C-alpha cells in the first residue's frame, strides 16, 4: 500500500529525515516513535502533501508516485491524516464539513452524493460510538473544542471517510486516560484487513490500547 525508500527531507537547509525506509502493507498497523526532532511529524506532513520540504527518495502509494498526487487526490484515493493540532475553522459547520468531505470522495469514485438526512443518521451513530455530544455536529469545526474533543472529532472523520491508509500524528497528545481509551476504541473498531494505520506517537501508553504489528523508532 505504502512504500518509502531512502526518504531524505529538509526544510530551510536543515536536514530532518536522513534516509527512511518503510513498507506498509494492506491490513497492517505500524507505529513510529522517537524524540522531538527525529522526523516523526515531518513524515506525516510529507505523506499528507504539506509544501515547503525538499525531499528525495521514492514514495509510492498503491504503486503511484506519491509526489505526483495532489493533496485533494490523496484524500480521494483513501489517505487520511489526523492532525496533532487540529485546525479551528470558524464559519464551517462540522456536520456540513464532514458531509462535503465524504461526498468529494464519493464523487471521485463515481458514486452519488449522500443526502443530508441520510448523512445525519450516519454521523449521529458514529458520534455516539465516540461519546461525542450531538451538539458538536452543529458547531463550527473545532472552534471552542477542548483538546480531547478535537482529537475525538478527528477520529469521527476517520470513521466517516473510511480511508485505506490512516496516519495518526500524535493523536494521543494531551489526552487524559478516558479520552485516550475512547480514541483507541474508535481506531480499533475501524481496523480491518482492508485498511492500514501509521501511528506516530511519543508515548508507549497509546500502544497499550492499539496493538501495532510493527514498531519503528526514529533517532
Residues of each region from the PLM?
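ABC-family P-loop ATPase nucleotide-binding domains
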Residues: 87-164
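The feature captures the beta-strand-to-loop junction immediately N-terminal to the Walker
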Residues: 33-35
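H-loop (His-switch) and adjacent beta-strand-loop-beta switch element
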Residues: 210-219
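ABC ATPase NBD Q-loop/coupling interface
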Residues: 58-74, 142
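Helix-to-loop junction immediately C-terminal to a conserved catalytic motif
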Residues: 48
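Walker B catalytic motif
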Residues: 170-171, 178
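Conserved structural motif at the start of ABC-family nucleotide-binding domains
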Residues: 2-4, 17
Amino acid at each position: 500500500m505504502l512504500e518509502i525508500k531512502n526518504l531524505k527531507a529538509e526544510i530551510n537547509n536543515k536536514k530532518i529525515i536522513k534516509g527512511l525506509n518503510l513498507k506498509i502493507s494492506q491490513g497492517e498497523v505500524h507505529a513510529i516513535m522517537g524524540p522531538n526532532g527525529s522526523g516523526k511529524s515531518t513524515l506525516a506532513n510529507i505523506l499528507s502533501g504539506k509544501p515547503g520540504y525538499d525531499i528525495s527518495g521514492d514514495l509510492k502509494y498503491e504503486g503511484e508516485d506519491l509526489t505526483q498526487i495532489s493533496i485533494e487526490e490523496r484524500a480521494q484515493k483513501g489517505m487520511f491524516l489526523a492532525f496533532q493540532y487540529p485546525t479551528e475553522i470558524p464559519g464551517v459547520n462540522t456536520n456540513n464539513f464532514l458531509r462535503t468531505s465524504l461526498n468529494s470522495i464519493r464523487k471521485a469514485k463515481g458514486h452519488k452524493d449522500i443526502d443530508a438526512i441520510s448523512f445525519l443518521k450516519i454521523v449521529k451513530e458514529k458520534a455516539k460510538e465516540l461519546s461525542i455530544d450531538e451538539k458538536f455536529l452543529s458547531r463550527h469545526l473545532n472552534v471552542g473544542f477542548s483538546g480531547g474533543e478535537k482529537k475525538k472529532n478527528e477520529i469521527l472523520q476517520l470513521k466517516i471517510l473510511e480511508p485505506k491508509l490512516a496516519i495518526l500524528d500524535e493523536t494521543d497528545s494531551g489526552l487524559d486516560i478516558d479520552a485516550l481509551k475512547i480514541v483507541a476504541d474508535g481506531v480499533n473498531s475501524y481496523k480491518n484487513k482492508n485498511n492500514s494505520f501509521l501511528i506516530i506517537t511519543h508515548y508507549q501508553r497509546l500502544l497499550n490500547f492499539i496493538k501495532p504489528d510493527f514498531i519503528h523508532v526514529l533517532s
